[in-house]
């Protein structure tokens, strides 16, 4: 059965994310593993001048395959334009939330086979990361001469995300002073 479109899972229109029942993976059988496996790429030991990050402006859920698509787009652009040793890229969210689907059949005679809304809890079909306004999703650290390439890479990655997002640039020297 094909995957449902992202609009089915992206926005939670009911009350705030109070949390559905039974979300711990050790209690849910058959949770598919997330497609995204690598969360850190590039050179983590470099001396960088800027942090460029993509943050969302609305609350919602980002599915694991959207995170993987954004990661691949950003990593491919950065590695081909500035090289693997000139940046540090990190995905800042993890898809903990388990998505379920109550499968419905749509063919002749399906009413004899399916239960309708009886026992409609659903089977796990994927995972998603829950995000809130202002939360960073992707982060790249670069030197000043590669700042424009980092912005373009994150613009390409942000186009793969289902929520409206923006890019912010943080000078790293000021952030170190604020943390101290």
Curated annotation (Swiss-Prot):
GO terms for molecular function: structural constituent of ribosome. InterPro entries: Ribosomal_uL16 (IPR047873), Ribosomal_uL16_arc (IPR022981), Ribosomal_uL16_CS_euk_arc (IPR018255), Ribosomal_uL16_dom (IPR016180), Ribosomal_uL16_euk_arch (IPR001197), Ribosomal_uL16_sf (IPR036920). PROSITE patterns: RIBOSOMAL_L10E. CDD domains: Ribosomal_L16_L10e. Pfam families: Ribosomal_L16. One of its GO terms (cellular component) is ribonucleoprotein complex. Keywords: Ribonucleoprotein, Ribosomal protein. One of its GO terms (biological process) is translation. HAMAP family: Ribosomal_uL16_arch. Belongs to the universal ribosomal protein uL16 family. This is Large ribosomal subunit protein uL16. It comes from Hyperthermus butylicus (strain DSM 5456 / JCM 9403 / PLM1-5).
